[in-house]
Amino acid sequence: MKLFKMFITLFSLVVLLSCEKNENTNSLKMDLDVVIRETDSIQIYYTQNTSVQFKEKQSFWKKVSGSKKNQTISIVFPDSIHPKQLRIDFGRNIKQSEIILNEIIFSYKKKSFSAKGEEIYHLFRVDESNTLIDKLIGSLKRKDENQLVGPSLYPKGDKLNKQLNQLYSEK
């Protein structure tokens, strides 16, 4: 019994310390609340200035397991990277009929902001060359079902940059 109490105490201490450490990190975390039915990959591009000239070397791939239910996909940027602009490319799986994007949450240190539903499209715009959108239900589809490139979101002007800068500020 004594060993069990000691184990519980030690476990609680580890949990508390790890939670405290995560809140003070200098990493930007982006959570996407999505429905992606087929296994796929998402590519996140970033710039560290206000440019929207996105390059392959400034991007991350995130593998996503298919599910008919909502799932949260978390992208954590290294401490040394504080993106100013972001682009989201939703997959390369041609079998992916649509993606439902419900919410995006950005967290940095103890601050966060989110965009839900149509609010997402105040911060991001769709790439009209390859994306069809239904803002009411958050549906993103390929414009041509045979194209390799999936739906894409680009920053809408400097709105995302301003929100991210507020997140990074010490105030």
Question: Positions of the model-derived regions?
Answer:
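C-terminal motif of bacterial Sec signal peptides marking the signal peptidase cleavage site
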Residues: V15-S18
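Extended low-complexity, serine/threonine- and proline-enriched intrinsically disordered segments
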Residues: V34-Q53, N102-S107
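Noncatalytic modules at the cell exterior or secretory-pathway interfaces
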Residues: T25-L32, P78-I88, L136-K141, E145
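Extracellular beta-strand ligand-recognition surfaces/modules
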Residues: N70-Q96
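Extracellular carbohydrate recognition and processing domains
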Residues: S51-D79, F124-V126, L132
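Extracellular carbohydrate recognition
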Residues: N93-I105
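Compositionally biased low-complexity segments at domain edges in trafficked proteins
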Residues: G117-N161
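Bacterial N-terminal signal peptides that target proteins for export
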Residues: M1-F7
